[in-house]
């Protein structure tokens, strides 16, 4: 049966093959571009602004950029603030 399918199957045209390959390449590039070049500087700038108001450890700030679909990016910022000191 597989032999019969082999001889009766139609070959894909080169345009559809090229399109599939291009889609694979584009998807792979999107995955490899995990962190934009400006993200470290953005983290430093955000940390600098936070330090104007609260004394925190730089390790307590995390910045992540997540891709959702083709045209949506989500910037997630997590800051662990120190506990408030008691005033007398």
Swiss-Prot record:
Q: Name one GO biological process term.
A: cell division
Provide this UniProt record's keywords sorted from A to Z: Cell cycle, Cell division
InterPro entries associated with the record: MinE (IPR005527), MinE_sf (IPR036707)
Q: Which domain of life is it from?
A: Bacteria
What is the role of the protein in this entry?
Answer: Prevents the cell division inhibition by proteins MinC and MinD at internal division sites while permitting inhibition at polar sites. This ensures cell division at the proper site by restricting the formation of a division septum at the midpoint of the long axis of the cell.
Question: Could you say which protein family the record assigns here?
Answer: Belongs to the MinE family.
Would you tell me the protein name for this molecule? Cell division topological specificity factor
Organism per entry: Cronobacter sakazakii (strain ATCC BAA-894)
What's the gene? Answer: minE
């Amino acid at each position: 049966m597989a032999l019969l399918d082999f001889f009766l199957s139609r070959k894909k045209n080169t345009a559809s093959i090229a399109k599939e390959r291009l889609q694979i390449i584009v998807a792979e590039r999107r995955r490899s571009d995990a962190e934009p070049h400006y993200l470290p500087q953005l983290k430093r700038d955000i940390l600098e602004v936070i330090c104007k108001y609260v004394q925190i450890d730089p390790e307590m700030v995390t910045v992540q950029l997540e891709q959702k679909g083709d045209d949506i990016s989500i910037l997630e910022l997590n800051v662990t603030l120190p506990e408030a000191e008691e005033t007398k």
